[in-house]
Structures are given as structure tokens and as C-alpha cells.
From Swiss-Prot:
PROSITE patterns: GTP_CYCLOHYDROL_1_1 (PS00859), GTP_CYCLOHYDROL_1_2 (PS00860). Toroid-shaped homodecamer, composed of two pentamers of five dimers. One of its GO terms (biological process) is tetrahydrofolate biosynthetic process. Keywords: GTP-binding, Hydrolase, Metal-binding, Nucleotide-binding, One-carbon metabolism, Zinc. The gene is folE. Belongs to the GTP cyclohydrolase I family. The lineage of its organism: Bacteria, Pseudomonadati, Pseudomonadota, Alphaproteobacteria, Hyphomicrobiales. InterPro entries: GTP-CH-I_C/QueF (IPR043133), GTP-CH-I_N (IPR043134), GTP_CycHdrlase_I (IPR001474), GTP_CycHdrlase_I_CS (IPR018234), GTP_CycHdrlase_I_dom (IPR020602). This is GTP cyclohydrolase 1. It comes from the Bacteria. Signal peptide: none annotated.
């Protein structure tokens, strides 16, 4: 599931056509029947179409390319020699096991070498990977790898904290439990002081 290369759109669809919208609506009607509902009652008549449109919006990450987002960089850092840190980047995703929401925040730092990127691009990278079926571990690694590949910084740090509705709504039903994952590259992997500085800023109250 996670063999999508950094910077590419979904290779699974290469040369393939997506099923038509009507087939998706029909599948959702079948699902409504399967759970014991009547898709012909007034409140559900338009639900299959609404659900299909909603999921089209929720999974836009399959249609976006990190390479395009990070393709424009600035090569003049004007003497800046410190990390760029963005915290509290809210996101939603869906777990690939149950297709149930994951809701959380991403905290990201990179140590520029010769390239910097607009701050909104970092947020868009998070959106690309979060708006796919995911595991939190894979998403953390994908964001870090994308920044390392395209910005070629001295170091990258990514920390994601999220609540998984598959643990909240079903199974063990532990409301409020959060999962934390990290990925450190370059100077952030080798330098414990830099890593500790990143963690301190992430944990500092706004």
C-alpha cells in the first residue's frame, strides 16, 4: 500500500481509468442495504452521491504530486543558519485498515542548506500524504523523505501526534489516546542537541 514513490501521483492509476461516479454511488447503495438500511427512504435518497463526493474530497492526495509542490524553491537563504520549524499543522487522514478517520497534528523542521521553500508548501505536503489511506508510521516517513529528497537540507525532523478513531470508536475504545511517531534525518538524526531543541519547541505551549 505504501509503495507510492516520493514526488509521484498514484502509480496504480497509471494507464487505468477510475470507475465511473455512478458505480461508486451504486456501491454505496449496496453498502446501505448491507448495514440494514433502506436507500430508498427520503433521508437517504441523495446519500450515495453525497458520500461519493465527500470521499473524492477526502482522498485528493492521490491526485497531487509532491514534486510539483516542492518544485519551486528559493536558493538564497540570506545568511539564515537556523532550522525552520512549523508546529501544530492540523490534518485528518483515514487508516488503511478500517477506513476510519485519523485526526492529529504534524510538527516539522528542516535545516536549510542552499534551498528554502514557501511555508504553505510544507502544509501542502502534509495534506498530500494525509489525504490518502494511511498508517501513521508510513505517513511520518513519507513526509520526512519528501522534504529530504526535494529540499536536500542538512536535516529533517517530523513528529506526528494523532488520535485514531479505530481505537476510539471500535475495538478497545480508548477515547483520547494519542499515538506519536517521529522521523529524524541528517543533522537531526546525528545531533542529539538539535533533536532535543526540536522536541522542546514542539512541546512548548503557544
Amino acid at each position: 500500500m505504501h509503495n507510492i514513490k516520493v514526488g509521484t501521483k498514484n502509480p496504480f492509476l497509471s494507464g487505468r481509468k477510475r470507475p465511473p461516479f455512478e458505480e461508486v454511488e451504486a456501491a454505496i447503495r449496496t453498502f446501505l442495504l448491507w448495514i440494514g438500511e433502506n436507500p430508498n427512504r427520503e433521508g437517504l435518497l441523495d446519500t450515495p452521491g453525497r458520500v461519493a463526493k465527500a470521499y473524492r474530497d477526502l482522498f485528493t492526495g492521490y491526485d497531487e504530486s509532491v514534486e510539483e509542490i516542492l518544485g519551486t524553491v528559493f536558493e538564497e537563504v540570506s545568511g539564515y543558519n537556523e532550522p525552520v520549524i512549523m508546529k501544530d499543522l492540523s490534518f485528518y487522514s483515514h487508516c488503511e485498515h478500517h477506513m476510519i478517520p485519523i485526526v492529529g497534528k504534524a510538527h516539522i523542521a528542516y535545516f536549510p542548506d542552499e534551498k528554502i521553500v514557501g511555508l504553505s508548501k510544507i502544509a501542502r505536503v502534509v495534506n498530500v500524504f494525509s489525504r490518502r489511506l494511511q498508517t501513521q508510521e508510513a505517513m511520518t516517513a513519507q513526509i520526512a523523505n519528501a522534504l529530504e529528497t526535494h529540499l536536500k537540507p542538512r536535516g529533517v525532523a517530523v513528529l506526528i501526534e494523532a488520535e485514531h478513531m479505530c481505537m476510539t470508536m471500535r475495538g478497545v475504545q480508548k477515547q483520547g489516546a494519542k499515538t506519536i511517531t517521529t522521523s529524524f534525518h541528517g543533522s537531526y538524526e546525528k545531533d542529539q542537541v538539535a533533536q532535543a531543541h526540536f522536541m522542546m519547541i514542539v512541546r512548548r505551549s503557544s
